[in-house]
Amino acid sequence: AIERLKHFVSREAFDIDGLGGKIVEQFYNEGILRDPTDIFTLEERNGGSGPTEDLFAVIDDKALHLERRDGWGKKSVENLFRAIRAKRRIELPRFIYALGIRQVGAATARLIARNYGSFRKFMTDMRNQDTERLLSIDGIGEAMAKDVVEFFKEEHNVSTVNRLLEEITVEDFVDNTNYNSPLSGKTVVFTGTLERMTRAEAKAKAQSLGAKVAGSVSAHTDYVIEGADAGSKAKKA
């Protein structure tokens, strides 16, 4: 469960400022976060930030009061809540990836989003075990389709998704890909530390230009983009 939460807030998923892996682990161990929906109820559960003089009110107060914790303050808590509120609208590819469906990486999530257009359409087909459209997507085979269907057959997963949809809005997919760019249809691999943008931003930019982003170099790789401290991928290329 804790790894699922870390995946949910990872860079290519919800990517919430101030809610990295260490904080997620701490909040999980203290029972503050148990599933992704808890992230979006944090502010409501936090309660007021002012001092309480009534001893009995303190005893009965079940609010989290994150600002009273070591290493936290009113400003840092406000920043966290602001970052969470900013992610109450999320792009469809990020949401699909954030669910942590087996074998569905960020690139595959984008392909699914592009083909289905809306999360409701995708979820309805998977709940009905209708994989015809899914299997028509280049790169998705029977094994992956089975894993996707199995995810939505698990009632706990469906319950979590439905609770999330009460808290957030998943935007329908808008294809802004430039299919006339020189990178359209090309396979690109990134390696090393990029100077002007994060790896996730670079991948998103390449995909918007019609490129396919791969995780490793192969015979199908057209371009390898090297940053600082490029590793084995650059040597292999």
Regions found by a protein language model. Name each.
Residues I2-E3, Q26, R88:
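Intrinsically disordered, low-complexity segments enriched in polar/charged residues with Gly/Pro
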Residues F8, G50-K236:
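DNA strand-break repair and replication-stress modules
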